Amino acid sequence: MSVKMEKIEKNTVELEVTVDAKVFSAAVTKAAKALANKVNIPGFRKGKAPRTMVERYVGTAALYNDAVDDILGVEYMKAVNEAGIEPVDRPDVDLIQMEDGKELVFKAKVTVKPEVELGSYKGLEVEKTAAVVTDEELEQELQRKQEQHAKVLNLEEGTVQAQDTVNIDFAGSVDGVAFEGGTAEGYDLVIGSGSFIPGFEEQLIGAQIGQEVDVNVRFPDEYHVADLQGKDALFKVKVNKLKRKEYAPLDDEFAKDISEFETLDELKADLRDKLMTAAEQRAEMEQKNAIVAKAVENASVEIPEAMVNSRIDMMLDDMAQNLSYQGLDLETYCHYTGTSMDTMREELRPRASENLKTELVLEAIAKVEGITVSEEELNNELAKLAERYQTSPENLKQALMARGDMGMYRQSLVSEKTVNFLVEQA
């Protein structure tokens, strides 16, 4: 095999690949045997017709095309490795010569990973945000603890209050006509959660268990279902059940009940320490992000459209998987939100480009600085990850390799080391 490479435009090269005549001839012979097993050739049992008869029966072009299909992928990857390029899209292939007994020659136009022109990335000055815990934040954390340990009371009687969980049946209509998604039975709604359209929840306050209530609302002008935007609606609502949370007072007894501490002051001190640790971690992460952002801003790189589109595809795949957990798909999501796949792709484009630039710049810095991840470091990180997922490092390693994600995982560790390097150099 021989490979000639020509740069035809930015981020695009053309490979002219010459495959040995013996390799192509062997591929033709193999293709002939495969075709002999598939087609019925008069006078011969399946698989017994000689190559000349197969070629005469199916045609030279069909035979040679099968041979090329069989070896093109392998020969292309050999050429890519020999040329030392990193394709980011499928090649555009043209066959130049395809004759038995002669070399197979093809050209492949390939979009490759772009070169990064690094700017300043050492000694970057970024102010670190001071980690602070306010009394208000501590109070909010105490309230969260109070919420977590609240008792839920199933009321036999009483009226709906704010923060109650009310179980309701409802049927909505616009101009007397029911609409899709406007009817449900046994629905649990937290009053004040804002999960229904404005005005709905407030009109249930004061209703009694078993009571039927007419709720009049107007759909917002920007409502996700276009047909309902700005429309007046009537909901017939029946209150089935009522739940209310009972909160323990914030005192020493509360501290004893939910923690190892004897007093509320001790609990507060512990919570403040934990909040401070979290605040320091956030400040550190913000500083890291700011340093990386500056290094990326100082660099220049022209990202091929194919790379951006591929990344958008990945982002949409992730989104589709997350939606599937809610019993939805992208098409349904687009319908509910009044958008389209094209609009979503364009909205994701800036983030996809920004993420790619960050990855490429970090990769370029790692290459210049010789930052790598050793097998020992890789195995140590795999062990930590395996412990988190309650599996063995070997099982995790096999799973990553089976999905073809090991290279991506290793690169993420290299990127992490590179970020730490930038912080150390700042």
Curated annotation (Swiss-Prot):
It holds the Pfam family FKBP_C. Disulfide bonds: none annotated. GO terms for biological process: 'de novo' cotranslational protein folding; cell division; chaperone-mediated protein folding; protein transport; protein unfolding. It catalyses: [protein]-peptidylproline (omega=180) = [protein]-peptidylproline (omega=0). Keywords: Cell cycle, Cell division, Chaperone, Cytoplasm, Isomerase, Rotamase. InterPro entries: PPIase_dom_sf (IPR046357), PPIase_FKBP_dom (IPR001179), Trig_fac (IPR005215), Trigger_fac_C (IPR008880), Trigger_fac_C_sf (IPR037041), Trigger_fac_ribosome-bd_bac (IPR008881), Trigger_fac_ribosome-bd_sf (IPR036611), Trigger_fact/SurA_dom_sf (IPR027304). Its EC number is 5.2.1.8. GO terms for molecular function: peptidyl-prolyl cis-trans isomerase activity; protein folding chaperone; ribosome binding. One of its GO terms (cellular component) is cytoplasm. It is found in: Cytoplasm. It is an enzyme of class 5 (isomerase). The keyword DNA-binding does not apply. Residues 163-248 form the PPIase FKBP-type domain. Involved in protein export. Acts as a chaperone by maintaining the newly synthesized protein in an open conformation. Functions as a peptidyl-prolyl cis-trans isomerase. HAMAP family: Trigger_factor_Tig. Consists of 3 domains; the N-terminus binds the ribosome, the middle domain has PPIase activity, while the C-terminus has intrinsic chaperone activity on its own. This is Trigger factor 1. It comes from Desulfitobacterium hafniense (strain Y51). The lineage of its organism: Bacteria, Bacillati, Bacillota, Clostridia, Eubacteriales.
